[in-house]
């Protein structure tokens, strides 16, 4: 695989920092540009971030002296890269405009932001689930008037535990309805315990917009391409409740599910164990070897013990049992700050690279 020059737009924030750590030794992607707000532009990355480096590993030496570019100077950034990762903290309309500006400058955008997730011709992709949605990109390029530029996005971090668990069961058994309660870590809000003292000894029973995303985005993932748009699926019906809990990293889901054709517990476990997708089949560098891991222990998975399984890119599942109101219930865990954020975007970029969309 050839090497691609990569930029990070929103490089000083928590997700931007995670992108930088993931790209430090990436075999295909070489970090050549860092962009952020005008107040950071012109400073070295080290000075722009200052004491706000939030990763557990030290800031990579290679980026410390890189001069931060102004993210709004699209042509200047685009000239230095083959594509960009975007993780900015702006209003939705501003993010939409910025990402389209990069795409129209013939610079593909792999976005961690939510702004374009429900745009009908923007593929929102989990590589193991709906890699075929990348085939909408020519239609998007036609709308944008670009030859090379496009936008592709990853889905919300709350989905990354329960959607992969449900997906392989849909073909043979037909998921009809699902109730999910998510217990979401503070890193999902860009916080640490030092910057979020209100969460200590507390649970906050509301995360703005999260329940709507958790109910609607899976239907787009399970949708199909019809002409120049992705049409969301109409089933299953999903209802969600999302809570912020005092955990540093790792989103959990408590899932209740009913099927059109109820499988046995053994059939579910076999399906999970055998499931693999294009990320595994193509041996993408960031892909977990085993995507879904099931724990037999009654008290697993746990964020503290299991969030880093397969370098934080796999999904952990446990406590599968029959239910009185639904057919089955189970719990699941994914690492929101890796699989659910920058790691998922890097995996998507690897898929795009293999499929030739950056060429």
Model-predicted segments: where are they?
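N-terminal Rossmann-like NAD(P) cofactor-binding subdomain of oxidoreductases
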Residues: 1-206, 236-237, 309, 315-316, ...
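Charged docking surfaces used in two-component/phosphorelay signaling
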Residues: 187-359
């Amino acid at each position: 695989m050839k090497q691609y020059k990569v930029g990070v737009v929103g490089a000083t924030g928590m997700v931007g920092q995670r992108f930088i750590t993931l790209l430090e030794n990436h075999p295909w992607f070489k970090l050549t540009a860092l962009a952020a707000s005008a107040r950071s532009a012109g400073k070295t990355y080290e000075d722009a971030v200052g004491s706000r480096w939030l990763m557990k590993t030290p800031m990579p030496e290679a980026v410390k002296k890189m001069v931060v570019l102004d993210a709004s100077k699209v042509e200047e950034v685009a000239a230095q890269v083959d594509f960009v990762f975007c993780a900015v903290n702006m209003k939705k309309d501003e993010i939409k405009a910025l990402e389209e500006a990069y795409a129209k400058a013939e610079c593909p955008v792999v976005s961690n932001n939510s702004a374009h997730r429900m745009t009908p011709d923007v593929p929102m992709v989990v590589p193991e689930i709906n890699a075929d949605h990348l085939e909408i990109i020519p239609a998007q390029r036609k709308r944008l008037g670009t030859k090379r530029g496009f936008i592709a996005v990853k889905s919300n971090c709350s989905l990354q535990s329960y959607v992969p668990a449900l997906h392989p069961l849909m073909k043979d058994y037909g998921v009809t309805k699902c109730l999910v309660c998510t217990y979401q870590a503070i890193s999902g809000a860009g916080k640490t315990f030092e910057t979020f003292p209100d969460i200590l000894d507390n649970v906050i029973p509301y995360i703005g917009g999260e329940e709507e995303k958790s109910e609607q985005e899976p239907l787009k993932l399970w949708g199909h391409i019809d002409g120049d748009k992705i049409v969301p699926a109409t089933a299953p019906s999903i209802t969600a409740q999302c809570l912020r809990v005092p955990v540093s990293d790792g989103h959990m889901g408590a899932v209740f599910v009913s099927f059109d054709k109820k499988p046995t517990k053994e059939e579910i476990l076999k399906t999970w164990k055998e499931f693999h997708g294009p990320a595994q089949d193509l041996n993408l560098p960031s892909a977990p070897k085993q995507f879904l891991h099931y724990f037999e222990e009654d008290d697993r998975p746990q964020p503290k013990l299991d969030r880093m399984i397969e370098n934080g890119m796999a999904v952990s599942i446990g406590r599968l049992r029959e239910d009185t109101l639904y057919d089955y219930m189970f719990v699941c865990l994914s690492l929101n700050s890796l699989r659910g954020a920058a790691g998922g975007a890097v995996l998507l970029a690897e898929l795009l690279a293999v499929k030739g969309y950056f060429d």
